[in-house]
Amino acid sequence: MSEEYLQSDLARAIETHSIESVENLNKSETVFYICDVLGVEPPEAHPSEHNGTVPRSLSQEWAKILAEEAEENSEENNDESEEDN
């Protein structure tokens, strides 16, 4: 299967987890932000040359990271509410 470049997966992951730190970034900035967070080299072509899309593998990796963070936050919130009771 060839690697597809889809912005929608990344956008969906960001929306789903309400990541405030990237809400105001444009597509080009988002590509570089995600690459920086993941510790990978950004695409050689400037994001505007490929409509700000990122490889599916990057968006899937980002979604995985967001899910882990959401789970950690959920566990912390559960611990705090148990302490309150």
UniProtKB/Swiss-Prot annotation:
- The lineage's top-level taxon is Viruses
Q: Where is the composition biased (Acidic residues)?
A: 68-85
Protein's name according to its UniProt entry:
Uncharacterized protein ORF29
Q: Which organism does this record belong to?
A: His1 virus (isolate Australia/Victoria) (His1V)
Polar residues compositional bias, start-end: 50-60
- Residues of the region (Disordered) are 44-85
